[in-house]
Amino acid sequence: NEVKKITCIDVDSDVIYRAKYELFKDFDIDFITGDVFEKYRDQYTTCDLFINTSCEHMSPMKEWGPWPKYKNPWWSRVSPAYFAFQSNAMFDIPTHTNCVHTIQEFKDQLPENAEVLIEDEVPDLRGTRFTLIGRL
């Protein structure tokens, strides 16, 4: 299948600037500086691939909804969809508010209907990195 649209959302304007003008300047990507949980939730309805390589900076994925404004949680609005999520056990970094100790603890943060297809742990000097790839 062909990729129809890529949207990158980050609260850090420096990250968006670097991605837009240095890393992916030759790609057709929509870059948005903002909180993915506030204004941009409607993006979920057309998304079929979620990539979050910084889950340690956010609430657990199963807590991304439902919100008062939406009757259904995000994962029931997008099925079928795939995901690639990463987190780590680097608890000593101040901005890491949601680190996990184990891959199982990370899996427990997924919505109930998530099916993990690939999981991986990579040791790092600062703490283990965890990767989950699957479908909703």
Question: Where are each of the predicted segments found?
Answer:
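S-adenosyl-L-methionine
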Residues: V11-L49
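Conserved SAM-binding motif I beta-strand of class I
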Residues: K4-D10
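C-terminal substrate-binding/active-site "lid" region of AdoMet-derived donor-dependent transferases
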Residues: P60-R135
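Generic beta-sheet signal
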Residues: I9, T53, A84-Q86
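Short, well-ordered alpha-helix to beta-strand connector turns
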Residues: V3, C47, V78-A81
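General small-molecule cofactor/ligand-binding pocket signal
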Residues: T7, D30-I32, L117
